Amino acid sequence: MSEELENKFLDLCHKYPTGLTQQMIEVSLGHKMEEIVKVINNLIKQGRLMLIQNSDETTSYKEVNPEDQAKFRGLGVEDFLIYQLIEASSNTGAWTRELKNSSGYQQVQITKILKTLESRKLIKSVKSIQSGRKKVYMLYNMEPSREITGGQLYSDQSYDHQYIQIMKMHIKTFVDNKGAVDLADIITYLRKVAEEATSQSLGPEDIQALVNTVIYDGDIEEMRDTRMGAMLGRRSGILYKPTKTPIPVNNFCNMPCGNCPVFDICSDNGLVSPKRCVYFKQYLEQDDESLDF
């Protein structure tokens, strides 16, 4: 009888892949609830059934994919709830504090559950660049969002300066050789360069950030002219061209005085003075080669 009821229950799971509610089970199966509970508990122990906690505090049940059943085998109700909360966080991940607030579990219990889920490769921890590289948790096969990883310009959640300098050099050279290009041209060219060099594909946001940096460096200029864009067959009217006039350098800004927040109250005989300034002393003690004139 239990095997027959189990098969009926699984058939019902196939019919409702998003989850079975308690009411649906009672109406569809028509057996005593004690018998159904035994079947449910047995399927959960086997890793064939997942328990889902709904927002209205009711419980649903969902069949686990055959390839994942070994990973879910033996998990308890608390494990499933934390897994469900992490699943709901999608590619942005969930903080341990969020898991604690949503579940009501103690931190020690959550830490233990997270270790269990990680060891079974159901979830993974990812360092976020947004909040001091704190860990967030997401499903094991989930690709973290750009807000978490920083995109392709970051390597192991750290700014990849060497890679960025190389890409900036390619942008400058490309614009110098072409004379005038739009962002689509740069994206096409830079994606090809990036894939050949690292087998990685840069996103439009990454490339736009690189282009902006090259502009700030004074190596290229942005032209906003819809007429010029129309002549060259560009829709946006925003083009990038080589910089004709180098941006002048103000060497006063290289000195501590140029960026000093207390410059206005500094005087020879005052409490703040060049004689007492630690930063000015360090600046004067530099070698000539290290001074940027």
Curated annotation (Swiss-Prot):
The UniProt keyword set, sorted, is: DNA-directed RNA polymerase, Nucleus, Transcription
Q: Where in the cell is it found?
A: Nucleus
Q: Name one GO cellular component term.
A: RNA polymerase III complex
One of the record's GO molecular function terms: DNA-directed RNA polymerase activity
Pfam families in alphabetical order: RNA_pol_Rpc34
Its domain of life reads Eukaryota
Classification via InterPro entries: RNA_pol_Rpc34, RNA_pol_Rpc34-like, WH-like_DNA-bd_sf, WH_DNA-bd_sf
Q: Name one GO biological process term.
A: transcription by RNA polymerase III
rRNA processing as a keyword of this entry, yes or no, is no
Grouped into one coarse class, the protein's main location is nucleus
**What SUPFAM superfamilies has UniProt attached to this entry?**
Winged helix' DNA-binding domain
Quick check: keyword Nucleus in the entry? yes
Give the protein's biological function.
DNA-dependent RNA polymerase catalyzes the transcription of DNA into RNA using the four ribonucleoside triphosphates as substrates. Specific peripheric component of RNA polymerase III which synthesizes small RNAs, such as 5S rRNA and tRNAs. May direct RNA Pol III binding to the TFIIIB-DNA complex.
Q: Which family does it belong to?
A: Belongs to the eukaryotic RPC34/RPC39 RNA polymerase subunit family.
Known partners and oligomeric status = Component of the RNA polymerase III (Pol III) complex.
Protein name as it appears in the record: DNA-directed RNA polymerase III subunit rpc6
